[in-house]
């Protein structure tokens, strides 16, 4: 891609009010396997393999919010509206009328209300870790988030901290950032050379 620096892949909103069943907002892998709504990994694969976007120009989107359904379980039917829930509203729900569950297919958590009336899919520090590892393994250009203000809790910015620990501290990531900075520097130097040549041409005329 010669005219675009990078693409921010919106690897979230995989499921929502338009779906025919309860599903994760941002499942790393399909849950259940083969779910036609797809997943983060199938989305990245489509952009890379089908659309031909280089992996190092793809940024993996990390959501700092979840989706709440009127339903009794993951992959079940639901009724009514699906409500977006910011991450900073979620930790206090755990063990306070809601039970934490982990989906081994999606590599994502979810909460079930104790009376089985609602389910909340979201990302936490653990699922963010898996997504960061995926971005590193696939040698993607980076990660991006939506949105900063959704992450602030009494324990600090927990999801940002997970990105810092599992992505920014990676040796592979540090090398990638160094390569990107070198590329930016080289492009800047090239632009300066072109500008100088253009100015000389004007003077010669």
Task: Enumerate the language-model features and the residues they cover.
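Substrate-binding surface in catalytic domains of secreted glycosidases
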Residues: 1-93
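Flexible, active-site-adjacent loop/turn segments at secondary-structure boundaries
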Residues: 10, 26-27, 63, 109-110, ...
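Short secondary-structure transition/capping segments
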Residues: 20-33, 102-104, 190-198
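Active-site rim elements
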Residues: 31-34, 115-125, 147-150
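Soluble or luminal CAZymes and related metallo-dependent hydrolases
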Residues: 35-42, 120-127, 155
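Acidic/aromatic/glycine-rich contiguous surface patches that form carbohydrate-binding/processing clefts
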Residues: 67, 124-204
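Hydrophobic, secondary-structure "cap" segments at the distal end of domains
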Residues: 83-140
